[in-house]
Amino acid sequence: WFYCAYDIGSGAFTTWVYGKSKEGIISDFYRQMVRNYAEWGMCLPAEIECESSLNSTFRETLLSEGAMFRYVRMEANKARGKYIERVWEMQRYGKEKEREGWLARPNSLRESNQKSDEDIPIIPYEEIANNCLEDIVNWNNSAHPNQEKYPGKTRWEVFLENQHPDLKSINWNMILPYIGYKTETSCKAGTIKLQRKEFFLGMNGKI
């Protein structure tokens, strides 16, 4: 399973996580998104479009409007309802289809994409994951489709160079309680020990 975030304006993938099952993948996805944007020195996007099956558990918390994102569009589970599904179609029937072990869908509308009678080899999990990661990197480093507007720029360059100046800073207070990791510690004389470091609790300039 791969779960990814895609920036519509630049056409770049900005977050990706994967695993052998869906369990826990949505929390890992949002954690990784926050890590990425914080590391890049960027604000989180103003808006997110997501499907409801995995995201509904955060509907009243992390994904309530104004918490992690200013605007949230949670779409019912229909393939044509989300923009990213068109991107997945390009990925699936583009580079992925050329790889050994590609699995066709038996009910595909196009005959060329339907399952054949040939035996499909079993590909190791690590190889599949690495191929998908390579495809994401190559996609991001490919030319932006609107070269008239962004001449000579890749999707990734357009993403980095065109962040909106009015985006709000990461709302840590609304994010950490729901996807942050918790570590128990003790407090003695206004001092907390955490990860082999000491932190002091203060108020009005006093510990």
Predicted feature residues:
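RNase H-like DDE/DDD metal-dependent nuclease/strand-transfer catalytic core used by mobile genetic elements
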Residues: 1-2, 6-127
